[in-house]
């Protein structure tokens, strides 16, 4: 149960953390949160993403017994906050959250694949998708192998 929540949260925070740092590159530009369509659009992507993960035999065993409604709320808040939205994420750091889980690189990559499928399904623009995914590589060491 905890494994599911932590891995998915890890991906969301990884993606969202990078977005927060990238969105301020151009003063006066619309926030990534707004460009993504706000909380409703983020929620739709997260719902689809969770469905992809649940159907993914490479990683779904990590999420058996997870509190899915809570997981979705947490992911939405993480992405919302990190992309410049009005939400607040109060969860643990990626290192804390993944300590002792021994997340494998292949599992991390599978989660990223599932997120990309959702972003593509909702026709997220190339710039926004790049911002969301750009930080994944940098955060990977905080998640994989902990």
Regions found by a protein language model. Give the residues of each.
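Extracellular zinc-dependent metalloprotease catalytic-domain scaffold
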Residues: 51, 133-134
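N-terminal, post-signal-peptide region of Sec/Tat-exported proteins
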Residues: 51-79
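A ubiquitous short alpha-helical element
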Residues: 30-36, 62-64, 96-104
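Post-signal peptide N-terminal segment of mature Sec-exported envelope proteins
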Residues: 25-52, 73
């Amino acid at each position: 149960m905890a494994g599911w929540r932590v891995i998915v949260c890890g991906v969301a925070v990884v993606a969202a953390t990078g977005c927060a740092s990238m969105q301020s590159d151009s003063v006066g530009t619309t926030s990534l949160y707004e460009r993504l369509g706000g909380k409703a659009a983020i929620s739709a992507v997260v719902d689809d993403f969770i469905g992809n993960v649940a159907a993914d035999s490479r990683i779904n065993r990590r999420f058996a017994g997870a509190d899915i409604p809570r997981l979705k709320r947490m992911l939405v808040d993480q992405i919302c906050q990190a992309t410049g939205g009005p939400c607040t994420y109060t969860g643990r750091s990626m290192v804390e959250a993944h300590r002792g889980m021994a997340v494998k690189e292949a599992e991390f990559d599978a989660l990223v694949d599932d997120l990309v499928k959702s972003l593509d399904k909702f026709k997220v623009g190339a710039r926004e998708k790049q911002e969301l995914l750009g930080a994944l590589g940098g955060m990977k060491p905080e998640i994989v192998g902990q």
